[in-house]
Swiss-Prot record:
Keywords, sorted A to Z: Hydrolase, Magnesium, Metal-binding, Nucleotide metabolism
Molecular functions per Gene Ontology: dUTP diphosphatase activity; magnesium ion binding
Name this polypeptide is given: Deoxyuridine 5'-triphosphate nucleotidohydrolase
Catalytic activity: dUTP + H2O = dUMP + diphosphate + H(+)
Pfam family, one: dUTPase
InterPro entries reported in the protein's UniProt record: dUTPase, dUTPase-like, dUTPase-like_sf, dUTPase_trimeric
Stated role: This enzyme is involved in nucleotide metabolism: it produces dUMP, the immediate precursor of thymidine nucleotides and it decreases the intracellular concentration of dUTP so that uracil cannot be incorporated into DNA.
KW Hydrolase (keyword) present: yes
Binding-site residues for substrate, renumbered to this chain: 76-78, 89, 93-95, 103
Claim: Hydrolase is one of the keywords in the record: yes
Length: 156
């Protein structure tokens, strides 16, 4: 169930020249957590991503993420499953004080070249609350049952 706030945060966008004609980022279903981001590549020159290659793709927009929130750029499950296309540095964080064009770092982990055309939905962005912790240095870590065990220490 999606929780609807009385006053959801407002996401202001600035459309850049390379974003002209592209749809605004949008939630594709009523319960969608992420809004789809589209490729702002040149319409006359689609980008071909060969297996093993990566590319930084423009979205054509500057996002003003509200203070106290972040934008999390994540892969689209269909592109990942069907073609091996994913976002590196996932989730990528768009901080609330960043004012440049949002770009998506895509990688082709599949076995075939993948063509990215203008307006194609390439990733999704989730707007999420941020907590900044107070950082303090201590002399020793507190004891726990788990201790320093990691990387499979609780079972696989």
């Amino acid at each position: 169930m999606t929780i609807h706030h009385d006053t959801p945060p407002t996401l202001n966008l600035i459309r850049l020249a390379n974003g002209e004609g592209l749809d605004l980022p949008a939630y594709e279903s009523k319960g969608a957590a992420g809004m789809d981001l589209r490729a702002a590549v040149d319409g006359d020159a689609p980008l071909t991503l060969a297996p093993g290659e990566r590319a930084l793709l423009p979205t054509g927009f500057i996002f003003e993420i509200p203070e106290g929130f972040e934008g999390q750029v994540r892969p689209r499950s269909g592109l990942a499953f069907k073609h091996g296309i994913t976002c590196l540095n996932s989730p990528g964080t768009v901080d609330s004080d960043y004012r440049g064009e949002v770009k998506v770092l895509l990688a082709n982990l599949g076995e075939e070249a993948f063509v990215i055309e203008r307006g194609m939905r390439i990733a999704q962005m989730v707007i999420a609350p941020v907590t900044q912790a107070r950082v303090t240095e201590i002399a020793a870590a507190s004891e726990t049952a788990r201790g320093a065990g990691g990387f499979g220490s609780t079972g696989v």
